[in-house]
């Protein structure tokens, strides 16, 4: 089992090769998966640690080779998926909806499963910023993928609510693309132009330990309650041509969900071990057991993004329900 924590340079070299070679056909028994940074990917950490894909593959008489990669940002993820450099990628709900929208009738990208519902906090070290209306052109908001990622799209939804639909991009110009670990360090240090960060677990909790950092907004405020943060998604080609591998992967996710819920302290240890995290175990346990967080494969409130982003003109295609952009294996659950 291979695990590569790719730098962006390596990532884009790989993408360039992908464009030259075209999409790669993969036989049953192989799957390449990419995740981003943070405890939002704990289900995948458990899958990897327990070798659950391999386990469920063997149950179907299949020896599956799993290739793990780590990339920051939805843009790089989506490019890697469409070039065939990766089979399965992970990102927030809005980036998944964007690629679903753009590939309808072509690669037909859809979501596989949720990776859990958890809040994302908009944080700042600027004492003058209490609400969204307090941000000025002098502020800089760090996000993993400016304008297009989960955090940016969530900010756009709230901006549209506060300032009107025609102003939904109001804060795009002061948004800066930066991986969560770097943005967290910058916010805590308080010595760079970055004075705000639309963060995610565990980074937001780490930042809030600093007395100079406070919360402005939660994604749960925007969406009206618990909502899916990250999802896994793939192309129709991979889904249809690799039914056993796909099913083994889906079954592995479901088992990982159960493992986490059965023993959350052990899951916290898994996160630290697999991610090689330097966070204190007590902090990770606090996050994993937070009642706001639910590690579930069932999608929650994803349709709010689909509906609003279509209304704003970001999505050309209108989904009738969440099932339009999830593969059928997820349809048995009471999602939204």
Regions found by a protein language model. Give the residues of each.
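Short, glycine-/small- and polar/acidic-enriched structural segments
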Residues: 29-168, 173-177, 191, 195, ...
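Pocket-lining segment of extracytoplasmic ligand-binding domains
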Residues: 169-176, 181-272
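Secondary-structure end/capping motifs
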Residues: 240-316
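Conserved C-terminal helix/tail region of periplasmic/extracytoplasmic solute-binding proteins
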Residues: 309-336
């Amino acid at each position: 089992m291979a695990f590569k924590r790719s730098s962006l340079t390596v990532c884009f070299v790989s993408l360039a090769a992908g464009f030259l070679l075209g999409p790669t056909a993969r036989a049953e028994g192989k799957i390449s998966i990419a995740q981003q940074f943070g405890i939002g990917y704990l289900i995948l950490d458990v899958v990897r640690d327990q070798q659950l894909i391999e386990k469920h593959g063997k149950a179907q008489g299949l020896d599956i080779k799993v290739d793990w990669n780590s990339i920051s940002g939805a843009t790089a993820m989506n490019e890697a998926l469409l070039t065939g450099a990766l089979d399965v990628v992970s990102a927030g709900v809005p980036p998944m909806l964007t690629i679903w929208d753009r590939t309808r009738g072509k690669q037909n990208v859809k979501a596989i499963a949720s990776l859990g519902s958890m809040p994302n906090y908009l944080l700042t070290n600027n004492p003058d910023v209490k609400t969204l209306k307090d941000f000025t052109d002098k502020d800089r908001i760090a996000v993993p993928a400016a304008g297009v990622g989960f955090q940016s799209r969530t900010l756009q939804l709230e901006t549209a609510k506060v300032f009107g639909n025609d102003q939904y991009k109001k804060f795009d110009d002061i948004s800066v693309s930066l991986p969560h670990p770097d943005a967290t360090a910058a916010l805590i240090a308080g010595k760079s132009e970055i004075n705000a960060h639309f963060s995610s677990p565990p980074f937001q909790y780490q930042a809030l330990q600093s007395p100079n950092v406070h919360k402005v907004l939660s994604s749960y405020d925007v969406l009206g309650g618990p909502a899916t943060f990250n999802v896994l998604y793939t192309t129709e080609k991979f889904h249809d041509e690799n039914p056993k591998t796909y099913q083994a992967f889906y079954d592995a996710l479901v088992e990982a969900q159960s493992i986490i819920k059965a023993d959350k302290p052990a899951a916290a240890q898994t996160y630290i071990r697999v991610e090689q995290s330097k966070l204190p175990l007590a902090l990770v346990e606090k996050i994993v057991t937070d009642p706001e967080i639910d590690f579930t494969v069932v999608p929650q409130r994803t349709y709010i993004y689909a509906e609003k982003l279509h209304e704003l003109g970001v999505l050309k295609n209108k989904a009738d329900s969440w099932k339009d952009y999830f593969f059928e294996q997820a349809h048995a659950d009471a999602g939204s």
